[in-house]
Amino acid sequence: MSRVSVKLVVFKHPDAARWGTYASYCPATHNFCASGKTIAEVVSSFEEMLVRDLENRMFFVNFKNWGWKVSENSAKSPNFADEYLISETERIFEVTIKDPQIITVDVELPKSRKTIGV
């Protein structure tokens, strides 16, 4: 089975009561839902969301709108410069990020199937 890699920006959010200690954003998936008390918790949560989205890749038209190349047997994400990753994360969260961590999240491509109502 093939693998899919995307970059995730993880940072300490100044509003920890709302977002958790760490928040994240992935411009390739437009996902800003993964947050938590540790970086490992954030990455684990994001991996689960990414696998779910990849399962639904043939039914989730936004992937193609966001520059992904998807088929029954493959998925290739768009590639972004690190500076863009950080600036988009700052724009989405409306904060200036100190000490951002860019983490490559690599998952096995799951079988394509509809698991959510998209």
What positions do the PLM features span?
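A short, exposed loop/beta-hairpin motif centered on an aromatic-Gly-Thr core
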Residues: C26-E41
